[in-house]
């Protein structure tokens, strides 16, 4: 299990990538680039054929990964390869619930432990239905990351009271994706979550520019960035796949990732 130290001058930067997009071995290099760019932790997404919470950018990434035969077991093992290849920041498996159900629970958590994965985030599992999975995470030393969306104060309080690692604060309802602006109500919602949470609060769903990062960092402890980074991978995929241009493409990706970065310390 992991915790994030709150240091006033530092901000949390949690990037998301899809396992196996564009290729598994490149995912490892992308993870290392994100670590170099200042990532506090990494969300490693398991590609899924029916990703209800994801917009078109991540849907396309899932399709590319699935076309390369990526699945939940291979994604977990890919996380283990990242650890063996110098990724020391926490790796959080981001997966829909159905792939977890298809594995025996003991087998699933044994795989997470064997591959030194640190956390689990299940976006389509409502808080009220997550008790069993949270208990299993505690039993196996895995940090369960909770999502909180705009809802009643009493429900926010229930979610934040049991939160571990950090709270993933959903900036807007609907699917993930790049957004140019956020509703005015987001500010009061984030302040409300932050006021109730004993762990850092990171805002995600739609963060796509350094200006938005600055705005969210004033309200919360940091940001989760997915679609913007996955879109950059999509733009660079041909250069990433070709050995002769890979190093240059990784440098371009790292430079782009740094525009979202803080320097939150992990303990």
Swiss-Prot record:
Q: What is its EC number?
A: 4.2.1.20
**Catalysed conversion reaction:** (1S,2R)-1-C-(indol-3-yl)glycerol 3-phosphate + L-serine = D-glyceraldehyde 3-phosphate + L-tryptophan + H2O
What would be an example GO MF term here? tryptophan synthase activity
Q: What's in the keyword line of the UniProt record? A: Amino-acid biosynthesis, Aromatic amino acid biosynthesis, Lyase, Tryptophan biosynthesis
Active site residues of this protein: 43, 54
Q: How does it assemble?
A: Tetramer of two alpha and two beta chains.
Tell me the protein family, please: Belongs to the TrpA family.
Functional description taken from the UniProt entry: The alpha subunit is responsible for the aldol cleavage of indoleglycerol phosphate to indole and glyceraldehyde 3-phosphate.
Put simply, this protein is called Tryptophan synthase alpha chain
Taxonomic lineage: Bacteria, Bacillati, Bacillota, Bacilli, Bacillales
The gene designation is: trpA
């Amino acid at each position: 299990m992991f915790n994030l130290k709150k240091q006033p001058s530092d901000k949390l930067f949690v990037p998301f990538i899809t396992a196996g997009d564009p290729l598994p071995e490149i995912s490892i290099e992308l993870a290392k680039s994100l670590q170099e760019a200042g990532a506090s932790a990494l969300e490693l997404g398991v590609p899924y054929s029916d990703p209800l919470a994801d917009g078109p950018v991540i849907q396309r990434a899932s399709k590319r990964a699935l076309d390369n035969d990526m699945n939940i077991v291979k994604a977990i093992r890919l996380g283990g390869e990242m650890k063996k290849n110098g990724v020391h920041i926490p790796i959080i498996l981001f997966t829909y619930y159905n792939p977890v159900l298809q594995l025996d629970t003991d087998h699933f958590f044994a795989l997470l432990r064997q591959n030194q994965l640190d956390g689990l985030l299940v976006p389509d599992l409502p808080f009220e239905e997550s008790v069993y999975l949270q208990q299993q995470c505690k039993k196996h030393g895995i940090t369960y990351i909770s999502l909180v969306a705009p809802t009643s104060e009493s429900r926010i309080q229930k979610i934040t009271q049991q939160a571990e690692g950090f709270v993933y604060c959903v900036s807007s309802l609907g699917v993930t994706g790049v957004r140019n602006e956020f509703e005015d109500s987001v500010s009061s919602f984030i302040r409300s979550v932050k006021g109730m949470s004993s762990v850092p609060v990171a805002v995600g769903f739609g963060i796509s520019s350094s200006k938005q990062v600055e705005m969210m960092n004033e309200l919360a402890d940091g940001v989760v960035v997915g679609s913007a980074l996955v879109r950059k991978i999509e733009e660079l995929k041909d250069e990433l796949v070709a050995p002769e241009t890979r190093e240059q493409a990784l440098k371009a990706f790292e430079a782009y990732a740094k525009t979202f970065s803080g320097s939150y310390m992990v303990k």
